[in-house]
Amino acid sequence: MGAKSKSSSTRFFMFYLILISLSFLGLLLNFKPLFLLNPMIASPSIVEIRYSLPEPVKRTPIWLRLIRNYLPDEKKIRVGLLNIAENERESYEASGTSILENVHVSLDPLPNNLTWTSLFPVWIDEDHTWHIPSCPEVPLPKMEGSEADVDVVVVKVPCDGFSEKRGLRDVFRLQVNLAAANLVVESGRRNVDRTVYVVFIGSCGPMHEIFRCDERVKRVGDYWVYRPDLTRLKQKLLMPPGSCQIAPLGQGEAWIQDKNRNLTSEKTTLSSFTAQRVAYVTLLHSSEVYVCGAIALAQSIRQSGSTKDMILLHDDSITNISLIGLSLAGWKLRRVERIRSPFSKKRSYNEWNYSKLRVWQVTDYDKLVFIDADFIIVKNIDYLFSYPQLSAAGNNKVLFNSGVMVLEPSACLFEDLMLKSFKIGSYNGGDQGFLNEYFVWWHRLSKRLNTMKYFGDESRHDKARNLPENLEGIHYLGLKPWRCYRDYDCNWDLKTRRVYASESVHARWWKVYDKMPKKLKGYCGLNLKMEKNVEKWRKMAKLNGFPENHWKIRIKDPRKKNRLSQ
């Protein structure tokens, strides 16, 4: 009985197990996903599946966060990356819905023999007596395809050797800045009004000689954001890479380094960049010694045929009587506060020479040609307004002479000049030394524009000390003509001044004087103090036995009879 009951239980359990297995199998065979049963039903499982898919990684580097508010929302941008090392690319590349492409622009290595002094030689053969001056090549990238069409340029600027106490003359730094400028200009070639942003990365920022502070949008730490003016930038690229050559103006094609610049396809002359508001400017401060010189300068500009505005900056040392004469000569007068040279000695000749920095505050003009008040202009030089800042004649070594300069007034530049004037040293304690450390990249003007009345090297001059007839401007060093008798150059009378003496050059200043209106000549008269000095120098020349025997000359200068009372 017990065995029968156990067998019955076993059969029942097996039947129950089979029944359950068949039911489970039926359910499994008839199961369908919900979204297949009814695709119109909004199933949470679909949303969950979509959000679980991996998204592309978005990269928003610092530079993009700084400029994205300036970029158009609807446009996809192409980014040009310059001087970014391969192992740093991931840190600067951007991605996302607004990024079309990251383009890496490579730089060719600089030649080993390319130095700053080879770009800025002491002297060039302007007259082509022995050879035609040429410039060494600064390799720039060849822009092709998408490389020549970017909306943003991101560039790491080299700052090795940077110091707040001096200018940075570095060829690699120049190459990087010129390459950035070239990339911007090429990108805007099809649309001159196009906006291209440049983000410079580096503590020293870009070269202000190429990228102006007026074009700076913002700065955050080592990031400098610029929106450059493409027309101005293009003009910079049309200039030689240094003072190794003078750029021709208004004569056929402008200077172009055609090996690596696509700009050669355009016959663009620099004269097309002439600014609308231009003027000549000079400065008088601390005394009235140069009042006559400034009047003669103004008259020489007018005698050359120029009708451009003439601005004279002056401090309180210039009397009302003198201001009347200066105004009659053609100067528009503006009063300024003089600026002391931080590194000059008290009561030295250059103690207040930094007052020249005030010319950058004349911001109602686009471009100025500054001329020292001891100059005369011999030929029309209005063409200078076609040159960019900073253009000047060479002085020595890699330096320019600040006696004549083409500059572009700017409030932010003046502020920067003032800020750095207390940090950057000056080799001569004056404005010229400081400006040469601030503007290390400059453009050479012809020596004919700023010919100095200096004859230190007798082997380079004839015995008569004549200057060439094709001069454009003469810089009167030494004792000034109006402080001598017109009969001869009184620089001959002093041993230390004889290097500045020349009868013919002295006479050229008096030709300008002779053409002045009579009412202006009185401002160039002799006073008692001046005459005593001249007579003292004549006696010294006699004691020294100088062979020219100028002390024997009978003075006929009419100013001697009509001596000024003061």
From Swiss-Prot:
EC number: 2.4.1.-
Membrane topology: Single-pass type II membrane protein
BP-aspect Gene Ontology terms: cell wall organization
Sorted UniProt keywords: Cell wall biogenesis/degradation, Glycosyltransferase, Golgi apparatus, Manganese, Membrane, Metal-binding, Signal-anchor, Transferase, Transmembrane, Transmembrane helix
Molecular function terms from GO: glycosyltransferase activity; metal ion binding
List of residues binding Mn(2+): D372, D374, H475
Main subcellular location: Golgi
Cofactor(s) essential for the protein: Mn(2+)
TM stretches of this protein: 17-37
Positions contributing to substrate binding: 372-374, 401-403, 428-432, 475-480
Sites annotated Important for catalytic activity: K356
Superkingdom assignment: Eukaryota
CDD domains linked: GT8_Glycogenin
Annotated compartments: Golgi apparatus membrane
Cellular component aspect of the GO annotation: Golgi apparatus; Golgi membrane
Entry's family note: Belongs to the glycosyltransferase 8 family. Glycogenin subfamily.
Job of this protein: May be involved in the substitutions of the xylan backbone in stem glucuronoxylan.
Protein's name in the database: Putative UDP-glucuronate:xylan alpha-glucuronosyltransferase 5
Source organism of this protein record: Arabidopsis thaliana (Mouse-ear cress)
Encoding gene (name): GUX5
